[in-house]
Amino acid sequence: MTAIYSNAKNWLVQADLLAKSGLTDLIAGKDSGAGYGKAIIGDFSIMMPAAYSLVRNRNIMHHETISKDGAWVRYVDGTRLDLKDVQFFWGSAALAQSDHTLLHEDKAKKAELALESILADLAVLNIPDGVKLSISLSNHNPERWADEIKRRVEGTHTFEHLHPVTRSIVTKTVEIVVTGIYPEGFGSIAHCLFGEASLVLDPSELAIALDIGSSTWLITVFNGSGAVIDRHLIEGGAGELHSMIAEALDKRNDKVSLLSKDVKHSPSLVNQGIIEGTFTYGGNHLTGKKFETEYSQCLDQWWSNRIEKFANFVTAGNYLDRAKYLVAWGGGVSLPVVDQNLADLGCVILNNPQFINALGLKLLTQISIGA
């Protein structure tokens, strides 16, 4: 059973377990995502912000870092000779740098930085040295990027990272085999039909899936054979909601102190307050402020606009009447109120919805290697 962790204590326990596991082969699925990358590696899961920052000044000291959602990595040697001695930050460690790249702002980066993303995952999970990793990946345009991704990712790679428990720098070598590169959402369908979720759907029957991600709502109509019948993209996922709330906070006239005067509120801190369930912006008494009211107001506007577009698409195509299931996944379906709204519509909300595509991609890896 795949372990889904959500706090640092569990992460450290799992990082220690995996390092001492003696495993030599790992099967994985990686969903590069928009705001967050998600991966299932062996029986472990990981989710990190899809952000990258190159270490330009190699003379700086003590910059190495690691946490449950970010890491410093140095590529030592291996198949990617162009990366030899390159150091970079990934995830929250990259967001902490002033000159970071967000992958959703340039979709080409999802392909160009595919290896760096995987190495950061392996660092945070603290894999044993000498592992062979078989992995399936997703991409928004496999026809354009599949060969490039495979060229960049496959091979033997030696890298350094900070050990999560001992906090010393360790060196690991991994052999990576890419078993498949699939369109976005393909893994989710595989998980629904052939994985743990197992929707009972005949080849002639339809299901409508709604994937609420960081950047978009993606509607996919598929049949019991796994074939995609139709797709429709609605711009403005959960990240848009976070931005709306941040802008609403900008307009509030309740300055707590001179230090918080004219502050520009961060969507990522809004998201943090939602995830923690506190609906509080900021982590200290100088900036901390409740935003339940802004959440409720912005959510109504965000939801009503997009659910109307969803309804228009599924009814115009005559899919709604024919669908046996409405199913929802993606990190956005777990948002407070959104989960209830979807349930009221009769949607099946899958467990661990943000990991559905990665779980399905891992399943596709298992099928491809006969595991």
Question: What are the language-model segments listed below?
Answer:
Residues 1-207, 227-234, 277-371:
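Nucleotide/phosphate-binding catalytic cleft detector across ATP-hydrolyzing
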Residues 57-65, 189, 218-262:
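Glycine-rich phosphate-binding loop plus the immediately following alpha-helix
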Residues 37-41, 217-222:
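Short beta-strand scaffold segments in enzyme catalytic cores
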Residues 185-187, 213-218:
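A short mid-domain helix/strand-loop element embedded in enzyme catalytic domains
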